Each structure stands twice: as structure tokens, then as C-alpha cells.
Amino acid sequence: MLPEIQKPMSILHHNVTTHNIKLDGVRAEGETYIIAFHQVLSDLGNYDVLIGGRYFDEYEKREGIWKFSSRAVDADWAYTADPSKVNLSHPMIEGANIGAPDSSDPSYAYLKNFKRGER
């Protein structure tokens, strides 16, 4: 499902911030704050969506390993810019690598131990 969602996006940048977990034996609940930026490609012109929200997670310990058992997504706010305000030629990022939501992302070359793309 995620690759289908990603098709119209040239930039996806999700930040996980505050993460609170409450344990109860072999079960746990978590609330995780997120900020997610997306630049969406459109025939009418690219636009940006910045979302602040939370994940409501449930976890279970199975055979000694903690795993997700469910997740709900909450959107607390959203900011849009139409047309897109992304400027990858701004002088402040001159000389920086530019990320991409696919195997052309610089992390594939720099982070060999992650073995990105391998299944």
C-alpha cells in the first residue's frame, strides 16, 4: 500500500518526536508525535502538505520480542502551500546531497550496512 501512496510524491520526510509508552505485562500502549512533510506532484502544479499528528500504538511481547499489534493515525493539524514553496536550489543547501524517495537517495551510497533495497 505505501508504494502506491508514494507515487505522486517527490519528497516524503517524516519525523518522530515525543514517544510515550505505558507497559502492562506483555502488552503496552504508545502515543508517538509525528511531523510529516510531503511535496505532492500534480499536473496542475506541485503543492506541499505539512501534517502534525500522532500514532496510537498497541504492542505485544511475543516469544520475548516486542512487536506492534495495531496502529491508529491521528492528524492534529495540517499546513498546505499551493503552489509548492520547496526550493532545492536555495543557497543555504548549496553543496548538500538532495534526498529522493527511491534508490537514487544518497543514503544508498553512504549507508552500506543498512542494505537498502535488499529483501
Predicted regions and their residues:
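Short, solvent-exposed loop/turn segments that connect beta-strands within catalytic domains
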Residues: S42-N46, G64-K67
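Low-complexity, intrinsically disordered terminal/linker segments enriched in charged
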Residues: D43, Y47-I51, A72-R119
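Intrinsic disorder/low-structure terminal segments
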Residues: A36, R54, E58, K67, ...
